[in-house]
UniProtKB/Swiss-Prot annotation:
UniProt region (Disordered), positions on chain: 1-41
Coiled coil residues, start to end: none
Taxonomic lineage from the root: Eukaryota, Viridiplantae, Streptophyta, Embryophyta, Tracheophyta
Biased composition, class Polar residues, residue ranges: 1-20
Keyword rRNA processing listed: no
Record's subcellular location: Cytoplasm; Nucleus
Name of this protein: WPP domain-containing protein 3
Organism: Arabidopsis thaliana (Mouse-ear cress)
PANTHER family per the UniProt record, alphabetical: WPP DOMAIN-CONTAINING PROTEIN 1-RELATED (PTHR34362:SF1)
WPP: region residues: 37-138
Role, per record: Regulates the mitotic activity in roots.
Gene that this polypeptide is encoded by: WPP3
C-alpha cells in the first residue's frame, strides 16, 4: 500500500477596502480592528502580539439579544420542550439575561478576552434555559390541570 503525504498550502492576503454600502455592517468589526491594531503596535515593541475579543461591541450584544428573543418566542428546540413565550416578554427576558451574563463575564481577567467570551456564552445559554424551565414549571402545572379538566369534561359529554 503506497502512502502519500498531504500538503497544506496557506495564502496570506491583505484585507480589501470596505465598500461604502457595508460600512454600517462592519463598523463594529472595524472598531475592534483599530483597537486591536493599536494594542498590537504596543505589544510588537516588546516582542508579542495581543488580540482581544472582549468586550463585544453593542451590535454584537444586540445580535445576542435578538437571537434569544427569537429562540424564546418562536419554534425552536427550546420552545419544543418548554413552549414559547410572547415576544414582548421574550424581549424583556433576553435583555435581562444578556445584561447579567455581560456583567458576570466582565469580572474575569483575560488578556485576549477568550475566557470572558466563554463565560458570556455559557451564562447566556444557562440563563435562557433556566428562564424557560421556570416559566414552564409555573405554567405547566396550570396547563396540566386544565388539560385534565378538559379530558374529564369530554368524558362526561
Amino acid at each position: 500500500m503506497a502512502e502519500t503525504a498531504d500538503t497544506i498550502n496557506t495564502t496570506v492576503s491583505t484585507p480589501q477596502p470596505q465598500l461604502e454600502s457595508r460600512s454600517d455592517e462592519t463598523s463594529c468589526l472595524q472598531k475592534h480592528r483599530s483597537d486591536a491594531t493599536s494594542e498590537v503596535t504596543k505589544e510588537e515593541k516588546s516582542g508579542g502580539i495581543l488580540f482581544s475579543v472582549w468586550p463585544p461591541c453593542q451590535k454584537s450584544r444586540d445580535y445576542v439579544v435578538n437571537s434569544m428573543i427569537k429562540t424564546l418566542s418562536t419554534d425552536s428546540i427550546l420552545s419544543y420542550k418548554y413552549g414559547t413565550i410572547k415576544p414582548e416578554e421574550a424581549s424583556a427576558v433576553a435583555k435581562s439575561i444578556e445584561e447579567k451574563a455581560y456583567d458576570i463575564a466582565s469580572r474575569f481577567v483575560s488578556s485576549d478576552g477568550i475566557k470572558n467570551l466563554e463565560v458570556y456564552g455559557i451564562e447566556t445559554s444557562e440563563r435562557m434555559i433556566e428562564s424557560a424551565e421556570v416559566r414552564f414549571k409555573a405554567n405547566g402545572s396550570m396547563e396540566l390541570l386544565l388539560n385534565q379538566t378538559i379530558k374529564m369534561m369530554q368524558l362526561l359529554i
